[in-house]
Amino acid sequence: MTGNILGEKLTLTSFGESHGKCIGMVLDGCPAGLPLSESDLQIELDKRKPGQSLITTQRKEEDRVEILSGIFNGHTTSAPICAIIWNSDSDSRPYDVIKNSPRPGHADYPSFIKYGGFADYRGSGRFSGRLTATMVMGGAIAQKLLRYTLRIETIAYTIQIGKISYTSSSFQQSKQNRYSNDVRCPDPQIAEKMKSAIVDAKKDGDSLGGIVESISVGLPAGLGEPIFSSLESDLSKALFSIPSVKAIEFGSGFTGAKLKGSENNDEYEISEDHKITTKTNNSGGILGGLSNGMPIIIRIGFKPASS
């Protein structure tokens, strides 16, 4: 295993470099018959496309996806699905100047030692945030597969930038409002404060970190495995693959570590539709590495951009 493949039954292989000809992914294990087209991937790619505002990278890329295999007559065939994006806006000249001077906070030094200076350093190569586009392509398919087969839905949104934070409300409100602003925060007023904080830091030649919250609903109880293949283990591996992620918590997380057991426990109850639920969700929907039927709640901490 070289670190470029994620998953077991459904595997995602990421390839390409930031300033190479293209970046792409291969998703293997998707069953036949799922309605799928390039537009399904493009909708998600457009949400992360660079250059959309003054607070994102100013690199201009169209990020138009091309599906090369695995789709026929608008449906998956069960063959590996390969999709690529061509790189077009890559000025590598600044990287020639710094190639022998490791930048603080970047992977320059450890990658130079590991690969003996042969790694593609342009735009940070395989360590670039641009490679998240390959995850978005694979994630778009996985997301549709989960909705289509199990009616599982996942949303994510920003709850903190620097010292400015947002307390999440209902699932539906967060789902509806999260793309109404540049920082992807469901509350428009707090979003403006977050954006202003980013702009102020940028004026000072600096950057800010943040926290993203993710909620998955519709999962049945019992998904996952104990010990080394717990849901927390598998999800953490995937999420730590995103550049700049430095912290993850499930449910009450680090706050729960300050509570008593009686305060952190989630008592069971029978809901109005006769389902077993819990009164609270401090476990974040996972107990013993298995889903318990409650929403899975994850928070991911991102360090400030290094340059």
Please tell me what each predicted stretch does.
Residues 15-21, 205-307:
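Glycine-rich anion/phosphate-binding loop at the beta-strand->alpha-helix junction
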Residues 1-59:
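N-terminal, positively charged regions that mediate nucleic acid binding
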Residues 1, 103-118, 208, 262-272:
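Acidic-glycine-rich active-site phosphate/pyrophosphate-binding loop
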Residues 45-53, 85, 89-91, 113, ...:
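Structural signal for hydrophobic packing residues in well-ordered secondary-structure cores
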Residues 44-104, 108-110:
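Glycine-rich, N-terminal phosphate-binding loop and its surrounding beta-alpha-beta segment
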Residues 51-70, 165-173, 177-189, 266-280, ...:
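A structural-propensity feature for long, helix-poor, extended segments
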Residues 21-33, 130-152, 156, 229-237, ...:
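Alpha-helical support elements that line or immediately flank enzyme active sites
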Residues 114-227:
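Glycine-rich, mobile lid/loop segments that gate access to catalytic sites or pores
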